[in-house]
Amino acid sequence: MTRLPLKLLLLMLSAMVALPGNAGDELAGYWQHESDPVWIDIQPETGQGVMVRNDNRPDRIGFLIVTDLETSDDHNAWSAQVFAARLGEYRKAEITLSADDRMVFTVKVGFMRRSVEWRRVSEVPPAPNDA
């Protein structure tokens, strides 16, 4: 192998690692809320997280919970706009992976901070009404 193709190969590999679409792959997939019957689908390629099931509010299916998802310098952290249900609006949030199967949204409002944990699931189970 000559030097030029090796340099080209290294450049291509570096570019692939730096692509935004690959940056959030660790977040991609289905997540269940820590205490509520709510499931979301995190889609790093679109920078969004969509509600795919909500047993208490089925009318919210399809609602964007996460928008503007972006990587940060930390390998296990991202920033995004997250819908804060109690406030009824999107707020800037930090999203972290505390483990491979645990995701945490942290929203700060003034001096207050609230964190919500999500657990990774392989699929979204059918809703009780669908069974």
Give the ranges of each region predicted by the language model.
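Non-cytosolic beta-sheet module surface loops
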Residues: Q32-H33, V107-V109
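Gram-negative bacterial Sec-dependent N-terminal signal peptides
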Residues: L10-M16
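Edge beta-strand at a domain terminus
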Residues: V109-A131
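Ligand-binding face of N-terminal immunoglobulin V-set domains in extracellular IgSF glycoproteins
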Residues: M103
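Bacterial N-terminal signal peptides that target proteins for export
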Residues: M1-L9
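Central antiparallel beta-sheet cores of small beta-barrel/beta-sandwich binding domains
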Residues: D25-K92, E123
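N-terminal signal peptide c-region/cleavage motif recognized by signal peptidases
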Residues: A18-P20
